[in-house]
């Protein structure tokens, strides 16, 4: 039983009480405009249950389009390039705003997409922004590849920002990275965009060309992404690195 009291309540709500603040928050996130996202997930036949749970819990901008493309049984570079070709050839999706690369062993936070979108709104000069994750194993390094201030092209792993800021780099991993769709329409870019070679992984192969054409990227160290080792290839089975 409630204690005796007289209640005079403002039914306007907390957000209405500070419309200026609410509007500024919505402007930062950009969810009031089109933020349609194609999600590309390269995978074998199965995705670990713990990883799948993190994917299911991802929040997307309300009432914006989302379509998920599962690229099964292909080498990862081929999976990305083939999926992108099919998307750009489809008039229903070719003009969407973003493409999110999400790998079968990466576990992003539930608000990760929204945070990356907010960063993209803040930094129109960047073509891609990824979440922060490390290579697997006890000696793992952050997938913040290359120092853009060095005049010599490089992909040395850079230090993360403990304060959760952006770190610009020469290339990103693809585990949880948001790209502007418009970049892939640039006819000057090499095709296939992604390809694993004897000397480069598919992501570094791609960025070696993207940067030559003026495209820039960064890692958002406030979006912390796990890297799941199901079989224990790098130590303990079912370890989240």
Predicted ranges, named:
Residues 51, 79, 112-113:
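Residues at alpha-helix caps and immediate loop-helix transition turns in enzyme cores, especially N-
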Residues 96, 123-126, 215:
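Short, high-confidence coil segments that cap the C-terminus of an alpha-helix
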Residues 2-73:
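N-proximal low-complexity "stem/linker" segments adjacent to membrane-targeting elements
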Residues 2-21, 27, 32-34, 188-241:
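C-terminal catalytic/acceptor-binding lobe
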């Amino acid at each position: 039983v409630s204690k005796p009291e007289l209640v005079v309540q403002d039914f306007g709500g907390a957000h209405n009480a500070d419309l200026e603040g609410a509007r500024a928050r919505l402007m930062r996130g950009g969810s009031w405009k089109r933020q349609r996202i194609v999600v590309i997930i390269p995978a074998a036949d199965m995705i670990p249950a713990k990883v799948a749970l993190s994917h299911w819990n991802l929040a997307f901008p309300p009432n914006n389009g989302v379509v998920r493309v599962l690229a099964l049984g292909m080498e990862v570079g081929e999976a990305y390039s083939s999926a992108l070709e099919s998307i750009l050839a489809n008039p229903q999706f070719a003009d969407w705003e973003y493409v999110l690369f999400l790998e079968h062993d990466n576990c992003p936070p539930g608000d990760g997409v929204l945070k990356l979108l907010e960063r993209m709104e803040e930094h129109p000069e960047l073509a891609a922004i990824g979440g922060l994750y490390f290579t697997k194993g006890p000696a793992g390094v952050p997938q913040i590849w290359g120092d853009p201030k060095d005049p010599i092209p490089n992909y040395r792993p850079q230090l993360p920002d403990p304060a959760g800021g952006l770190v610009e780099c020469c290339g990103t991993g693809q585990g949880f990275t948001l790209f502007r769709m418009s970049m892939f329409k640039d006819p000057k870019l090499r095709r296939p965009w992604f390809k694993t070679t004897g000397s480069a992984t598919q992501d570094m192969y791609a960025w070696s060309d993207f940067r030559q054409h003026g495209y820039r990227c960064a890692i958002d160290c406030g979006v912390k992404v796990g890297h799941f080792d199901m079989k224990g290839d790098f130590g303990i089975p079912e370890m989240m690195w």
